[in-house]
C-alpha cells in the first residue's frame, strides 16, 4: 500500500498555498470593509432599519449575478477570473477610501459602494471554491474547502482586531488597507499553474444557458433540497449577522472595539467548525452531518436572543459560529460532490443564488424590531430583554428554524443519506 507523503497531498503544493494565502488576505480586506461600513452607517443614521437595509443591498448582487458567474467559472480559466475579480475589488475600495478621506459621502453613496462590494464578494465566493476543487480534486475536496474557509476565517480575525480601532478614529483608513489587501491577493495567485489538475475539460463552442441549472435541479434531489435548506438557514439563521452592530451597542452596551472583538470571536468559532471538517473530512455521511449542524445553529440563534450578559452572549455566539461554519462548508462540499465535474460552477452558482434569500430574513428581523419599538409593550418583555426588538426577533427566527430543520430531517431522505 503506497504511503501518503506531504509531497503527494495537494495542500503542501505551491498552487494551493498561494490560493490559501490569497483567500486569507482578501478576507481580511472584505471583513474589515464590512465591519467598517456597518459601524459608519449606524453612526451616521442611528437606525436599525438603515443597517439592515445595508446588508440587504450587499446581498442583492447574489440574486442577480451568481448563476452567471457560475456559468462563466465553468467556461474560462478560474485562476485568471479570480485574479481579475479581486483586482476589481481593490479598485472599488481605493476609490471609496478617497471619498471617505475628502468627506464626500452620504447614505446613498455608501449604498452604491455596498452594492459594488457585494458583486465582488459573491463572484469571489463562487470562483475561489471552484478553483480550490480544481487544485485538490474530489478526494480532498472536504479538506480543501475547509482549509480555504479557514483562511477566510483567519482573515476575519485580522479584520476584527484592526477594523474597530481604525474606523472609530479614521473612516478612510480601513478601506485603503482593504484595497491593498485585495490587490495583494490578486497578484499572489498569478504564478499558479495555468491549468489545474482537476479543471473540467471545456468545449470552446459551449455557451452558458440558464436552462442547464434548471435541468440539473429537476433531476438532482440532493442539490434541490440543499438549496431549499440554504434558503431556510439564510432567512432564519445567518440573518442574525445583519443586526450584530445593534446587538453589540444596544444589548451589550458596547462600542466599536467590542464590535471588533465579536468579529474575532465569530471567526474563532468558525475556525473550530472548519477544523472539525478537516479532522473528519473523510466521513461519508455528510448529509446527516449537515442536518445536525443546521439544528445546532437553530438552537443557538434562539438562545442568542436570550443572552443579556456578556459571558452568555460570547458562549452562544461562539457556538453559533461553530455550527454555521460547518453548515457553510458542508453546503459547498455537497453542492460540488452531488454533480458532475463540468457542472460544479453551475451548482455553486445555484447555491450562491440561494444566499440571495438573506434579505428576506433581514426584512423579517426589521419588521419585528419595528413592531416591538412601535407598540408600547408591557414590562413583561422588558424584564427579559435589554433590547426587546432585536432579541425577540432572534427568538422567533430560532424557533421557526428549529421546526423547519426538524421537518427536513424527517422528509429529506436523499440528503440525509447522502454520502460523498
Stretch-by-stretch model annotation:
Residues 2-61, 215, 219-266:
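Helix-loop boundary and gating motifs at the non-cytosolic
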Residues 26, 58, 148-152, 266, ...:
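Structural signature of transmembrane alpha-helices in multi-pass secondary transporters
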Residues 37, 123-136, 326-339:
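Intracellular juxtamembrane helix-capping segments at the cytosolic ends
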Residues 102-105, 148, 152-189:
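Helix-loop-helix hairpin linking two adjacent transmembrane segments in secondary transporters
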Residues 130, 134, 175-204, 283, ...:
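Helix-loop junctions on the cytosolic side of multi-pass membrane transporters
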Amino acid at each position: 500500500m503506497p504511503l501518503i507523503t506531504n509531497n503527494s497531498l495537494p495542500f503542501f503544493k505551491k498552487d494551493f498555498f498561494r490560493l490559501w494565502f490569497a483567500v486569507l488576505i482578501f478576507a481580511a480586506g472584505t471583513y474589515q470593509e464590512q465591519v467598517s461600513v456597518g459601524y459608519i452607517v449606524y453612526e451616521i443614521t442611528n437606525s436599525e432599519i438603515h443597517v439592515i437595509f445595508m446588508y440587504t443591498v450587499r446581498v442583492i448582487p447574489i440574486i442577480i449575478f451568481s448563476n452567471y458567474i457560475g456559468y462563466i467559472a465553468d467556461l474560462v480559466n478560474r485562476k485568471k477570473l479570480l485574479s481579475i475579480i479581486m483586482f476589481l475589488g481593490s479598485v472599488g475600495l481605493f476609490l471609496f477610501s478617497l471619498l471617505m478621506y475628502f468627506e464626500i459621502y452620504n447614505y446613498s453613496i455608501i449604498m452604491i459602494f455596498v452594492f459594488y462590494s457585494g458583486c465582488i464578494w459573491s463572484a469571489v465566493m463562487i470562483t475561489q471554491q471552484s478553483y480550490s476543487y480544481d487544485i485538490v480534486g474530489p478526494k480532498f475536496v472536504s479538506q480543501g474547502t475547509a482549509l480555504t474557509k479557514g483562511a477566510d476565517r483567519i482573515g476575519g480575525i485580522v479584520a476584527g482586531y484592526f477594523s474597530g480601532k481604525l474606523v472609530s478614529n479614521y473612516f478612510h483608513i480601513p478601506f485603503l488597507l482593504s484595497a491593498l489587501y485585495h490587490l495583494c491577493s490578486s497578484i499572489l495567485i498569478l504564478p499558479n499553474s495555468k491549468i489545474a489538475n482537476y479543471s473540467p475539460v471545456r468545449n470552446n463552442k459551449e455557451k452558458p444557458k440558464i436552462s442547464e441549472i434548471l435541468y440539473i435541479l429537476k433531476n438532482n434531489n440532493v442539490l434541490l433540497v440543499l438549496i431549499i435548506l440554504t434558503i431556510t438557514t439564510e432567512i432564519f439563521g445567518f440573518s442574525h449577522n445583519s443586526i450584530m452592530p445593534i446587538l453589540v451597542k444596544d444589548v451589550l452596551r458596547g462600542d466599536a472595539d467590542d464590535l471588533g472583538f465579536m468579529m474575532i470571536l465569530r471567526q474563532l468559532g468558525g475556525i473550530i467548525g472548519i477544523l472539525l471538517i478537516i479532522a473528519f473530512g473523510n466521513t461519508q455521511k455528510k448529509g446527516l452531518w449537515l442536518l445536525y449542524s443546521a439544528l445546532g445553529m437553530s438552537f443557538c440563534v434562539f438562545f442568542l436572543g436570550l443572552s443579556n450578559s456578556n459571558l452568555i452572549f460570547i458562549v452562544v455566539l461562539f457556538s453559533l459560529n461553530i455550527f454555521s461554519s460547518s453548515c457553510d462548508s458542508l453546503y459547498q462540499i455537497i453542492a460540488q460532490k452531488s454533480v458532475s465535474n463540468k457542472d460544479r460552477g453551475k451548482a455553486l452558482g445555484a447555491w450562491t443564488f440561494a444566499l440571495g434569500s438573506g434579505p428576506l430574513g433581514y426584512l423579517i428581523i426589521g419588521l419585528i424590531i419595528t413592531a416591538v419599538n412601535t407598540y408600547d409593550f408591557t414590562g413583561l418583555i422588558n424584564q427579559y430583554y435589554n433590547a426587546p426588538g432585536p432579541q425577540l426577533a432572534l427568538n422567533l427566527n430560532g424557533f421557526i428554524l428549529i421546526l423547519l430543520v426538524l421537518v427536513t430531517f424527517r422528509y429529506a431522505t436523499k440528503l440525509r443519506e447522502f454520502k460523498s
